[in-house]
Amino acid sequence: MSEQDEVPSEDRRKYEFRKVIEELKDYEGSGTQLVTIYIPPDKQISDVVAHVTQEHSEASNIKSKQTRTNVQDALTSIKDRLRYYDTFPPDNGMVVFSGAVDSGGGRTDMVTEVLESPPQPIESFRYHCDSAFLTEPLAEMLGDKGLYGLIVLDRRESNVGWLKGKRVQPVKSAESLVPGKQRKGGQSAQRFARLRLEAIDNFYQEVAGMADDLFVPKRHEIDGILVGGPSPTKDEFLDGDYLHHELQDKVLGKFDVSYTDESGLSDLVDAGQAALAEADLMDDKSDMEEFFEELNGGKLATYGFEQTRRNLIMGSVDRLLVSEDLREDVVIYECPNDHEEYETIDRRNTSPEHTCSDCGEEATEVDREDAIDHLMSIADQRGTETHFISTDFEKGEQLLTAFGGYAGILRYSTGV
């Protein structure tokens, strides 16, 4: 696969992360000898080196000679890798994996892997030594989708924040000046009711102002807004059109929550799980609906590895659609007559023998690589977006089972 000078797309970076994580997850150590270190972006590399040095010293107390040697070798390898970094890690931090993994027949191989700049910032430093690498936090980052606005309010207070992946981030809060329902002596009931309504209206405007300040600048990136609180507060707030008009269209739903402090934001996320799951699949569903429309009535659809690849080379693919669950390699064959052919196989299988379909001669394997990498490399060169499609809905499952996991929506018809 040719090297790309341009910065890889976000989808491509996530896919590369996913591949490495799946490989690391399969490794096993014969004892607690596989070391994982999560390093947040604000952690000085010198502090990490000092911690690794301390762990190396403490590892000398491990009773098993083999485990002791393997742990210390892993820590030495990590220190060697850390020398390549300046004062701080790259953006979003980094994760270092190192250890002697079982390779069968009683043998071990030393593996060291560094994953830089994960999809979300690493929040805290973590040192982990076990019989398996700690990959779950990274896997959760890759599974996280979307940016959502959160608003919780009652007539006493309000909190506004973000849901970024699975991370709830409180940002703004306000307390109301709405008086209780009991009026003070000397006030007429009518005047008290009017003043109370004015205070409620002012508070709703203040909440909307917080939300507008936070969400409007991100209105083209935000995937939805959840609003929570008791009835009728949240209903009055939404029905009163207090939110900016471009944000009103982003509201996914309103939900009953008991608390409106910062903890209420997490309660709101829990209450809105169904709406969030549906929103996460919205883009995938839209892509697949368009694909099926073009497949059934238009001419701007292609599917299957070979047809999709040929359209990519012609530059005719607007969006490359790939199943998230696809795990295949592509084997490239050449025959004595210089015909080149491609065959996709399960990445766990050995390459099969191949006969050239053009001339019938026996073909020789000349290369083998990850099939998705192969297509994305062409897509990057042609300005084609790559969208990974979930199998958590019917048409997404059909992409994998009925169309081989590869499809494309075309810019123009090619007849291929």
UniProtKB/Swiss-Prot annotation:
Coiled coil ranges: none
Main location: cytoplasm
Summary of the function given for this chain in its UniProt record: Directs the termination of nascent peptide synthesis (translation) in response to the termination codons UAA, UAG and UGA.
Pfam family, one: eRF1_2
Cellular-component GO terms for this entry: cytoplasm
Subcellular location per the Swiss-Prot or TrEMBL entry: Cytoplasm
Domain of life: Archaea
InterPro entries per the UniProt record, alphabetical: eFR1_2_sf (IPR042226), eRF1_1_Pelota (IPR005140), eRF1_1_sf (IPR024049), eRF1_2 (IPR005141), eRF1_3 (IPR005142), Peptide_chain-rel_aRF1 (IPR020918), Peptide_chain-rel_eRF1/aRF1 (IPR004403), Ribosomal_eL30-like_sf (IPR029064)
Record's protein name: Peptide chain release factor subunit 1
NCBIfam families given in the database record: aRF1_eRF1
One term of GO molecular function: translation release factor activity, codon specific
Subunit: Heterodimer of two subunits, one of which binds GTP.
Family: Belongs to the eukaryotic release factor 1 family.
Originating species: Halobacterium salinarum (strain ATCC 29341 / DSM 671 / R1)
Gene3D superfamilies: 1.20.5.170, 3.30.1330.30, eRF1 domain 1, eRF1 domain 2
Record-linked HAMAP family: Rel_fact_arch_1
UniProt KW keywords: Cytoplasm, Protein biosynthesis
Keyword Coiled coil: no
